[in-house]
C-alpha cells in the first residue's frame, strides 16, 4: 500500500442499527478496494471484520474492528462498529477518534432506534456524515420515505446525490445527479465493474428535477455556490463537489447515497463520496488539551514534527496479550520509544506498533498524525487516557462511559476455574469500561454487571472459549442506584492501635441530596487548623469509596454532596489510615440516617406493531409502569415510544409476541435513573 500524506487520509466509521447491512457494506468496501480477495458474507459467518467466534455464530458485530484500505489516491482507515444497543459504548469510543462517518440505513426499516442513538453520538463529537440507504432490492423498500425519516428523526438536512433505478426486485442501478449518468453493475464480476450510461428517457425529467433541488440545497448551505446560483453562472461539477464538501464538513448537509450492498450495487460511488466529501485530519479543528499541572490550554496540530499527542480509545486482549488502539493527533509514535501518560503520571515504553486489519496485524516502525494503530507494550495505560511526549505533557479530554444496568451472579464450577476467574475478569475489565465486578458481601458471590443481557452473555461465552473458565450463572438482576432524601450530619472517630502504632482521626460530614444526574460532589468547609490540609484528599477518598456501596442494598450512591464540616487532630497519632476510615464511617452513618431510597434504571422502549394490536400493547406497557411518550405511523405499522423501568421489562419479548401474534418488535436502551 502506497504511503499517503495527511490530505489523502480518511478516518471513518460505519454506523447503523443492527441488521441495516453495515458489515455487508464494509465487506464490499474491502473487496472493491482490493483489501480482501473474497467477499465475506455475514449470513455465512465469514465476514472479515466479524472475526470473533461469537460474532460469526450470531451474525452480529460485537466489537469495533479496524482496517485500512486504499481507494484511488486516498487511504481510508475504517472502523466497523456494532449495531446492537448493548454495545453502544463500542460505537461511542470509536466516534471519539473518527473524522467522518457513514450511516447505513435499511430502505425498509428506515431510521431505527439504534440508528438515532449512534447518529446523535456522532453529532456530540461534531462528526461529518454521509448516509447510505441500503437494501433497495428488498420488498417494501422506500428510498424517499427513508430520506424523510432522516430529515425528521435525525434533524439533518439530507442532500440527495443519487436516485434508485427501479425498486424491490426490479432495482437495477442508480442515477448519479452530479454526473447525470446512470450506473449499472455487472453481476458476472460481483459488481466489480459497472457501466455509466445516459439516463433513460423515462427518468430524465425526474433526474433534472432532483438535480435542480440538489443545487438549491447546496446553495443555501454554501456562499460560493449561492453566488454562482444567483448570478446564473454555470456551476461546474468540480465546483459543486467542492461546495458539497464544505457544507458536509461544516455539518450543514448530509449527502444521501443509495444501493444494495448484498447485491453488489452502489459501493464504488460511496467510496468516491467518502473521498470527496468527508474530511481529512487537516480539515477538522485541531484537538485541544490542557497542561496536566498548569491547566493551560494546548492546541495539538496535525504535524509530524510537533510533540506527540495521542488517545487510547480501546483496549483488547488478543491471544492473551494487551493491545491498545491509539489515534495519533499530533507528532509521531515510534516503535521502541518512551511515552508519557499524564493521567497516571507515568512513563511507558512502546514495544511494537501495528497496522490493523480486523484481527490480523502488520508491524510498522512509526505512526504520524491521523493514524489509527494498535500498540503493544503499554502496561498501566487504559481506555480514554492520553499518550504524549515526556517533555511536552498534554492531557486530552477523557471519555465518558455508560453506567451498567443489569447484573448476574457467577460462581466458578471447579477449583481450577476459581483460580483463573479473578485473572480472567481483570482482562475483561481492562478491555471493557462498561463492565463492573464486585463481591456480594452477604453471599460472597461475584456480581458481573453490564449494559444488557446480550453483553453479559458474550462475556461469559468468551470466558469459556478464550480462557477455558467455566461458571454457573444466576438470573439477570437489575442494577439499581441509591440516594438520600434528607440532609444529615454525622461524626465518626477512629482511635485504635494497629500493628503497634496509634491511629487517630475524627471527621464530621454533612450529606445532602442533589438534583438528579448531578453526580457526587465533595467539598471542605473546615477551619484551616482543625485538620492538617494534607489529610483532606484522604478524607475525600474515604467518602467517595464509601459512596460506591450504599447502606440500603449495597448499590452505588448517586447525586449526593458530602461536605467536610469538622473533626479533630491528635499530633502524635493522626494518620492517613485513621482519617480515611473515619470519613468512611461518618459517610455510612449519614447515609443510613438520610432516608435512603432506590433509583431504577429507566429505559427508552420503542415498540413497532400493526395498528390492530395497539390497544393491547399500550395497556401492557402501562401495566409495567410505562409512560407513553409518543405514537407515530411508520410503513403500515405504529411506533410506540415509552419509558419503562428496566425491572418491569423482563419477559417482555414473550409477552409482545403473544399479544401481537409474533408481529410486534421492540428495542430498548438505557435512558436515566429515577424513582419508579
Which functions belong to the PLM regions below?
Residues 1-676:
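Structural and coupling elements of P-loop NTPases
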Amino acid at each position: 500500500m502506497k504511503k499517503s500524506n495527511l490530505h489523502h487520509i480518511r478516518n471513518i466509521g460505519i454506523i447503523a442499527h443492527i441488521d441495516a447491512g453495515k458489515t455487508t457494506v464494509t465487506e464490499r468496501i474491502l473487496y472493491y478496494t482490493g483489501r480482501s480477495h473474497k467477499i465475506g458474507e455475514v449470513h455465512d459467518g465469514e465476514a472479515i471484520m466479524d472475526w470473533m467466534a461469537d460474532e460469526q455464530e450470531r451474525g452480529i458485530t460485537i466489537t469495533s474492528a479496524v482496517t485500512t484500505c486504499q481507494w484511488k489516491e486516498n487511504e481510508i482507515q475504517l472502523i466497523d462498529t456494532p449495531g446492537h444497543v448493548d454495545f453502544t459504548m463500542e460505537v461511542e469510543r470509536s466516534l471519539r477518534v473518527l473524522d467522518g462517518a457513514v450511516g447505513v440505513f435499511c430502505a425498509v426499516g428506515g431510521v431505527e432506534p439504534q440508528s438515532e442513538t449512534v447518529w446523535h453520538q456522532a453529532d456530540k463529537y461534531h462528526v461529518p456524515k454521509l448516509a447510505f440507504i441500503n437494501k433497495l432490492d428488498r420488498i417494501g423498500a422506500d428510498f424517499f420515505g427513508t430520506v424523510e425519516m432522516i430529515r425528521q428523526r435525525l434533524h439533518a438536512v439530507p442532500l440527495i446525490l443519487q436516485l434508485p433505478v427501479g425498486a424491490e426486485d426490479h432495482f437495477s442501478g442508480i442515477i448519479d445527479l452530479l454526473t447525470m449518468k446512470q450506473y449499472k453493475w455487472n453481476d458476472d464480476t460481483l459488481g466489480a465493474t459497472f457501466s455509466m450510461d445516459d439516463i433513460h428517457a423515462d427518468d430524465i425529467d425526474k433526474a433534472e428535477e432532483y438535480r435542480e433541488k440538489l443545487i438549491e440545497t447546496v446553495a443555501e448551505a454554501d456562499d460560493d455556490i449561492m453566488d454562482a446560483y444567483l448570478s446564473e453562472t454555470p456551476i461546474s461539477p468540480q465546483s459543486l463537489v467542492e461546495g458539497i464538501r464544505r457544507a458536509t464538513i461544516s455539518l450543514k448537509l448530509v449527502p444521501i447515497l443509495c444501493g444494495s450492498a448484498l447485491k453488489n450495487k452502489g459501493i464504488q460511488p460511496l467510496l468516491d463520496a467518502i473521498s470527496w466529501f468527508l474530511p481529512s485530519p487537516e480539515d477538522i479543528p485541531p484537538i485541544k488539551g490542557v497542561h496536566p499541572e498548569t491547566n493551560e490550554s494546548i492546541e495539538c496540530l496535525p504535524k509530524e514534527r510537533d510533540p506527540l499527542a495521542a488517545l487510547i480509545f480501546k483496549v483488547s486482549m488478543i491471544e492473551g496479550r494487551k493491545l491498545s488502539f491509539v489515534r495519533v493527533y499530533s507528532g509521531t509514535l515510534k516503535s521502541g520509544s518512551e511515552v508519557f501518560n499524564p493521567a497516571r503520571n507515568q512513563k511507558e515504553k512502546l514495544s511494537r506498533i501495528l497496522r490493523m486489519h480486523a484481527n490480523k496485524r502488520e508491524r510498522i516502525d512509526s505512526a504520524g498524525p491521523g493514524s489509527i494503530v494498535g500498540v503493544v507494550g503499554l502496561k498501566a495505560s487504559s481506555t480514554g487516557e492520553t499518550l504524549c511526549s515526556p517533555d511536552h505533557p498534554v492531557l486530552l479530554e477523557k471519555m465518558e462511559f455508560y453506567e451498567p444496568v443489569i447484573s448476574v451472579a457467577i460462581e466458578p464450577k471447579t477449583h481450577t476455574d476459581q483460580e483463573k476467574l479473578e485473572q480472567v475478569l481483570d482482562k475483561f475489565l481492562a478491555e471493557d469500561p462498561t463492565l463492573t465486578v464486585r463481591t456480594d458481601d452477604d453471599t460472597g458471590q461475584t456480581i458481573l454487571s453490564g449494559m444488557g443481557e446480550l453483553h453479559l452473555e458474550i462475556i461469559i461465552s468468551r470466558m469459556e472459549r478464550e480462557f477455558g473458565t467455566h461458571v454457573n450463572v444466576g438470573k439477570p438482576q437489575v442494577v439499581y442506584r441509591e440516594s438520600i432524601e434528607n440532609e444529615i450530619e454525622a461524626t465518626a472517630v477512629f482511635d485504635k492501635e494497629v500493628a503497634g502504632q496509634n491511629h487517630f482521626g475524627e471527621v464530621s460530614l454533612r450529606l445532602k441530596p442533589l438534583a438528579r444526574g448531578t453526580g457526587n460532589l465533595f467539598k471542605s468547609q473546615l477551619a484551616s487548623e482543625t485538620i492538617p490540609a494534607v489529610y483532606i484528599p484522604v478524607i475525600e477518598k474515604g467518602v467517595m469509596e464509601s459512596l460506591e456501596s450504599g447502606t440500603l442494598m449495597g448499590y452505588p450512591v448517586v447525586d449526593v454532596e458530602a461536605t467536610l464540616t469538622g473533626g479533630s487532630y491528635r499530633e502524635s497519632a493522626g494518620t492517613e489510615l485513621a482519617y480515611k476510615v473515619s470519613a468512611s464511617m461518618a459517610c455510612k452513618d449519614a447515609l443510613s440516617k438520610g432516608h435512603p431510597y432506590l433509583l431504577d434504571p429507566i429505559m427508552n422502549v420503542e415498540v413497532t406493531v400493526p395498528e390492530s394490536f395497539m390497544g393491547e400493547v399500550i395497556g401492557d406497557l402501562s401495566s409495567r409502569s410505562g409512560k407513553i411518550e409518543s405514537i407515530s405511523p411508520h410503513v403500515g405499522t405504529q411506533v410506540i415510544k415509552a419509558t419503562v423501568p428496566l425491572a418491569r421489562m423482563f419477559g417482555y419479548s414473550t409477552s409482545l409476541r403473544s399479544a401481537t401474534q409474533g408481529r410486534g418488535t421492540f428495542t430498548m436502551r438505557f435512558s436515566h435513573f429515577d424513582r419508579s
